[in-house]
Amino acid sequence: MGRRAAAQPATETTATRAAAVTVTTPPPTGRRRRALATAACTTVLLTGAAALTVPASAAPEPSAESTVEAVAAAPAQVAAACGEGSYQAEAVLNGSTWTARRGSSVTYTGTDMRAAIQAAVNSLTAGRTSKERVVVRGSGSISAGSRVSLPSYTVLDVCGTINVTGTGSGDQAPVYSRGTRDIEVQHLNLTGTPLYGVFLRNVQNVVLGELDMRLSRGLGVRIDNRGDTSQWTRNVRIGNVYVSGASSHAVETYGVDGLTVGTVTARNVGESGLLLNQTINATVTKVDADGAGVGTGYAAFRMANRNGRVGSSYPTNIRVGEVIARGGGRGVFCVSESGGAVIDRINLTNTGNNAILIENCYNVNLAAQSGTVSGGGEIRLAARSEFPNNRDITVQNLTVTNSSLRESPCGENTTFRNNRLVNSTQSIC
């Protein structure tokens, strides 16, 4: 059976051991195995102007199986090629001239890509209650100090590349929306120096499809509720996001209830690959980070600021299929009263800081299916004095090579089981 460490004094810490330790535990039940497999294979991507989503509920405690099965049951659609299908307005580049039109009506002609896209968006039906779509055909530049603002019930499909130039301040982004609902970005390619690639605040029913951001500054995708923290941003679906070169995070959320993410791929970003702050009811298929947060305490996957806390408790509501980290800062980092999380598979190699750091977190299950940690910083269960200590942490199914596993101080109801140490040490309670 696994070794359980209840709230024991630090003096009862076991002696450090370097030998391989393997404990066999029963396999998951058939139902659990099927649910986990289904979740790992499901990536939800909604496309098309008529694809509407349903607001998340007020965060009732889900069961392990029901949440995964509900996500798996969501309609998965194959993403159409950029620009295909019907649309209501378009912005088209011909030579050096942009033209925005709706039907036979021309709403803009000139050399300004941002103005053309905004004119196309503004030509959509006023006061609409169903989605209308704008297609952008062509590549161009937008200033970092400006934005394309999307009102409610708007679909944007960018078939080309937006290069963000110069500097700016505040919450400027090539794609921006605030206080809206039913926003969709089907395709988006970005380069350059944005403050944010996509900035969404206090929104509901958001779909982000295929996003590719090859940046030299800024933050990739930021979705939050910081305009009115009394209201959750609700029901956000992200297909696949690739971000390289950002000086901050690839993807960050804050104050979101109801999040579904396919894959976040982060390459040489300055901080985290995926950072979830105060986000509940989230399902993530994969985080794949290489060189995320070099020289920092950020991580390929980070949870902070009471992430996963529903009311005053931590039911399992954050589900991650796989976290991959190569180099960078940390691999997995849970901090500041976060929890309610299960990470099925972990693959961490040569992280510059802790491979895993769990600090003042509650109900976190690491490597529920399998995991490897090779080289890099230690696996550490720690605590700061300003928050209650770790509670209900499970570390299991890990093969740890050329590293160490350490718990200090002793947490409450910590479980270590089925971990194999290869040329590694262990000091746990």
Which residues are covered by each model-predicted region?
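Secretory targeting and sorting signals
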Residues: G2-P60
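Beta-strand repeat architectures
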Residues: V121-K131
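Intrinsically disordered, low-complexity Ser/Thr- and acidic-rich flexible linkers and loops
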Residues: D224-Q231, G295, F301-Y314, S385-F387
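Short glycine/acidic-rich loop motifs that flank beta-strands on beta-rich extracellular proteins
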Residues: A144-R147, T165-Q172, T193-F199, R217-I223, ...
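Right-handed parallel beta-helix
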Residues: D157-T161, R181-G192, Q204-R217, W232-G245, ...
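C-terminal region of N-terminal signal peptides and the immediate post-cleavage residues
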Residues: A49-V78
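N-terminal extracellular ligand-recognition/capping segment immediately after the signal peptide
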Residues: S130-Q172, L190-P194
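Right-handed parallel beta-helix/beta-solenoid
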Residues: A70-A119
